[in-house]
């Protein structure tokens, strides 16, 4: 609700949003660290607190981007993301060894792509190709994380961590598809 109010829009226009975005990013990382620690200690309370911090701050950060698109574009991105999630989730369970082998390669490609995006951002160059690369990499991560979710002991802290890992993968695919579809309008 807060992100749809006029006072929020004025704050964004005034440039006061940078500390909010930076703080939200830091808290998102804190939530991820808490969930990881909770999974290793099997602490339900720490896991849930980490999840609340992660989900609320990540959602706040994502809402900044969603405000720039119309509903048909968001709907199309949602449908495409759901299809990718279904297909790569099924592939992750069907071909786990493949996803185990390519996980490290995908992570390396992701880091290289982030560095390239930073350079391209300062050069003012279109990043459509990097959007496609990130979609492919995170689709692979969806397969890998789906596979991993089937191998960990079925406890609440593990479930929260695995769901959060998949959420990050899915939201990254969604935001990149949204970015590509939004350029067509």
Regions found by a protein language model. Name each.
Residues 1-185:
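A hydrophobic alpha-helical transmembrane-helix feature that marks the membrane cores
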């Amino acid at each position: 609700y807060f992100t749809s109010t006029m006072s929020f829009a004025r704050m964004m226009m005034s440039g006061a949003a940078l500390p909010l975005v930076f703080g939200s990013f830091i808290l998102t990382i804190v939530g991820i660290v808490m969930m990881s620690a909770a999974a290793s200690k099997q602490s339900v309370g720490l896991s849930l607190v980490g999840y609340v911090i992660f989900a609320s701050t990540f959602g706040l950060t994502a809402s900044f981007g969603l405000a720039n698109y119309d509903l048909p574009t968001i709907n199309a991105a949602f449908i495409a993301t759901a299809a990718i999630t279904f297909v790569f989730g099924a592939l992750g369970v069907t071909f786990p060894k493949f996803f185990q082998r390519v996980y490290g390669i995908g992570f390396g490609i992701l880091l290289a792509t982030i560095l390239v995006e930073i350079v391209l951002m300062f050069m003012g160059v279109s990043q459509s190709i990097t959007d496609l690369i990130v979609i492919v990499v995170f689709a692979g991560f969806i397969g890998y994380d789906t596979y991993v979710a089937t191998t960990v002991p079925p406890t609440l802290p593990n479930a929260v961590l695995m769901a959060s890992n998949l959420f990050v993968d899915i939201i990254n695919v969604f935001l990149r598809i949204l970015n590509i579809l939004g350029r067509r309008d």
